[in-house]
């Protein structure tokens, strides 16, 4: 679900000091992202999120494709996941899988939605209304490139939900 496909695997046997044998598996991967991804820039975030998925601390679904496709962190992908689940609960017609695919196709829009959310709610400083308006204009401009009406509706509903949000605990750090 990270937007990659395994194209090769090389196992290596490692003999431990106690005589037991462990295995190291080296996987060759191919990116399936809809947009070019700079893996080197996203490597740390990807590795942290992969470990969290492996340990059951982060959901394993198609929103994780946005880590490489849109350069999001696992936490930012969780933000979009939460809005998608909320929309489904209040009567959204699109499945989570379809919403995930929409954002995988339009990764820049996913990134802009996260920026919009951060601009509106980040406690690190008040973002001007003009900056928020500019982000909304960028989103509207990107929507002109969305060919599918359903995809357009999904993105617009996310903008509506972010704008309807009054407060959030998203920025609370868990201990």
Where are the regions a protein language model picked out?
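Non-catalytic regulatory/linker segments of enzymes
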Residues: 1-175
């Amino acid at each position: 679900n990270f937007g990659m496909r395994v194209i090769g695997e090389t196992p290596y046997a490692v003999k431990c000091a106690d005589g037991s044998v462990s295995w190291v598996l080296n996987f060759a991967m191919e990116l399936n992202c809809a947009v070019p991804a700079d893996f080197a820039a996203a490597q740390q975030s990807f590795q942290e999120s992969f470990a969290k998925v492996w340990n059951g601390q982060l959901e394993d679904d198609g929103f994780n494709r946005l880590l490489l496709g849109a350069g999001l962190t696992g936490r930012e992908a969780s933000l979009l996941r939460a809005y998608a689940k909320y929309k489904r609960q209040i009567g959204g017609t699109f499945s989570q899988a379809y919403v995930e695919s929409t954002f995988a196709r339009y990764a820049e829009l996913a990134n802009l939605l996260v920026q919009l959310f951060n601009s509106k709610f980040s406690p690190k400083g008040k973002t001007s209304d003009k900056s928020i308006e500019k982000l909304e204009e960028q989103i509207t401009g990107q929507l002109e490139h969305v060919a599918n009406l359903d995809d357009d509706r999904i993105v617009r509903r996310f903008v509506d939900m972010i704008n309807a949000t009054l407060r959030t605990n998203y920025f609370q750090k868990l201990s």
